[in-house]
């Protein structure tokens, strides 16, 4: 039993040691969609263009001051994210770790929500978090 407690304690210490403090962004940063616009009615595939003011873009894994990269939430609520952990890569949370500023999505017909989250070189949210307004589009 004591070995188990020691092992669990070691794992917890390792997790805390690996946890990075969230970086503070400069004041006045804006994350937004260039396209599509909120309420747009489109056909799939949908081209999505990302906007950013007040910071720069850098690939994931490369630490430069005041830079980061985009993540796109598709039909996912920002409030569901664990901001104290790196963002997971899923079919609903798309990483653009090469520094991309646009993508093409194949979406099923119907209403969809999109939201951008800008994160640091470790896929970690800034503190305070940087994100766009959520937009809703309709794919016809």
Would you name each region that the model predicts?
Residues 108-123, 131-135:
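Internal, hydrophobic beta-strand segments that form the core of beta-sheet-rich folds
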Residues 83-105:
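A beta-strand/beta-hairpin structural motif
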Residues 21-43:
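Short, compositionally biased P/S/T/A/G/V-rich stretches that sit at domain boundaries
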Residues 46-50, 101, 110-118:
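Short, well-structured beta-strand segments within conserved domains
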Residues 1-4:
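Positively charged n-region of N-terminal signal peptides that target proteins for export
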Residues 51-62:
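Short amphipathic, basic-aromatic surface patches that mediate peripheral association
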Residues 14-16:
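N-terminal signal peptide c-region/cleavage motif recognized by signal peptidases
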Residues 62-70, 131:
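Short coil-to-beta strand junction motifs in C2/discoidin
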């Amino acid at each position: 039993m004591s070995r188990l407690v020691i092992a669990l304690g070691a794992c917890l210490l390792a997790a805390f040691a690996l946890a990075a403090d969230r970086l503070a962004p400069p004041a006045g940063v804006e994350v937004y969609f260039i396209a599509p616009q909120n309420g747009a009615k489109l056909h799939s595939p949908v081209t999505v263009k990302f906007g950013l003011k007040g910071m720069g873009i850098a690939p994931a894994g490369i630490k430069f001051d005041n830079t980061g990269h985009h993540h796109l939430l598709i039909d996912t609520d920002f409030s569901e994210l664990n901001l104290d952990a790196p963002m997971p890569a899923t079919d609903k949370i798309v990483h653009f770790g090469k520094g991309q500023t646009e993508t093409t999505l194949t979406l099923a017909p119907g209403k969809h929500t999109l939201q951008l989250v800008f994160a640091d070189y470790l896929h970690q949210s800034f503190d305070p978090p940087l994100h766009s307004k959520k937009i809703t589009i309709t794919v016809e």
